[in-house]
A protein has these predicted regions:
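Non-catalytic, topology-defining segments of multipass membrane proteins
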Residues: 1-47, 79-191, 195, 259-341
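Transmembrane alpha-helical segments that form the membrane-embedded catalytic/substrate-channel core
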Residues: 45-58, 84, 88, 133-139, ...
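Histidine-centered catalytic micro-motifs
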Residues: 52-60, 88-100, 208-216, 241-257
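Aspartate-rich (DDxxD/NDxxD/DxxxD) Mg2+/diphosphate-binding motifs
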Residues: 53-72, 100-110
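Short acidic-hydrophobic sequence patches enriched in Asp/Glu that either
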Residues: 64-72, 84-87, 199, 261
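Membrane-cytosol interface motif
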Residues: 71-80, 219-232
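Cytosolic juxtamembrane regulatory segments of multi-pass membrane proteins
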Residues: 226-244
Length: 341
């Protein structure tokens, strides 16, 4: 991969492009036609989507060696996104431990055995077109749900982070209102389309989740995910700036592995298990094309995709494990890509 463990380009390139690009977007560079503005919105949405990828790395605490730096960086990003760092981390820990099962908070409702096909189809639309609201709801469930698995310490941290989000956004709204009332800022000149890149970035994140998991029946971390590993430069550059998250099977099996080790982890697994067909795709487009039928035919994972509810991690997990899973059996191999229409 580009630079392996070198992090700084990820934190410099897309934030810089996004900030400079926003200036161009707001000032009308390229014209003010609807098509030009939509192109700007999609481009900037992708930039912010890449920037938000660092939130995922902070949750895993794999950006450098400082735990505190990861935590506070994650809290800053989470405050901006409206998703408390601790909510995301606790939900994501269980996503790795209980992937594609009923205990997987991140893949609700697609993993819930009792969720109707109609509800899951409707939620797909919400996950894409209302992603800016869907993401905080899905991640926040672990805090608000009855019989929440969160410890009291985690609940206290979540409460404080929700308060910080409310204060941050409340201050911005109040400040803009005061500036407007005093004639310093004319909100009538504000174009709501300038906000469009944000929900588009959230939609990119929702579709990324689908590409990684939707339609996958197996609960084995390697076989129950789609992995993208290509040789063309477009795929590899996109992978680099998304912290190699598309090498998703190894990421799920080795949650504590730094992103730049995932390709070698996959090669090691393939060498040990030459007879197992792993869902590896050469391009993002190939993975997306495999996902698209699942969006409507049967948007589900695990039981809802024809698999089982079997887990490979003990109950009550409270942190990422070093390695999740087992030696893939012929049964798991057989259901890895099976879907139910």
């Amino acid at each position: 991969m580009l630079g392996d463990g070198v992090l700084w380009p990820r934190f410099l390139v897309f934030p810089t492009i996004a900030i400079v690009g926003y200036v161009g977007f707001v000032t009308g560079v390229g014209g003010d036609s609807l098509l030009v503005r939509l192109i700007w919105s999609v481009f900037l949405g992708y930039c912010w989507f890449c920037v938000a990828g660092s939130f995922h790395e902070a949750v895993h605490q794999t950006m450098g060696t400082s735990r505190n730096a990861n935590v506070w960086f994650g809290r800053v990003v989470g405050t901006f996104l409206g998703i408390p760092y601790t909510v995301y981390r606790e939900s994501h820990i269980r996503h790795h431990a209980y992937m594609n099962t009923s205990d997987d908070f991140e893949l609700w409702p697609y993993c819930k055995p009792g969720a109707s096909l109609a509800f899951r189809r409707a939620f797909v639309l919400f996950d894409i077109f209302g992603a800016i609201l869907a993401n905080p709801i899905v991640y926040g469930r672990i805090y608000f749900v009855r019989n929440s698995p969160l410890s009291q310490q985690a609940r206290t941290a979540v409460q404080r982070e929700y308060m910080a989000i409310a204060v941050f956004w409340g201050s911005i709204i109040a400040g803009m209102t005061i500036l407007s009332l005093n004639g310093i800022v004319d909100l009538q000149r504000f174009d709501l389309m300038w906000l469009l890149p944000m929900p588009i970035a959230a939609a990119f994140n929702g579709f990324r989740k689908f590409t990684e998991h939707l339609g996958m029946a197996s609960t084995d971390p390697i076989l129950g995910t789609r992995t993208v590993l290509g040789k063309n430069w477009v795929t590899r550059v996109c992978s680099y700036f998304n912290f190699n998250l598309d090498i998703h099977g190894p990421h799920h099996r080795f949650p504590r592995a730094p992103h730049f080790e995932l390709e070698s982890k996959l090669a090691e697994y393939q060498l040990k298990h030459p007879g197992i067909v792993i869902p590896v795709f050469p391009t993002y487009l190939a993975a997306v094309m495999d996902t698209i039928p699942c969006l409507w035919q049967n948007p589900g994972v695990g039981v809802n995709a024809g698999g089982t509810n079997q887990t490979f991690v003990k109950a009550g997990v409270e942190n990422f494990t070093s390695e999740v899973g087992r030696e893939a059996s012929s049964e798991a191999d057989g259901i890895a890509n099976r879907r139910v229409a």
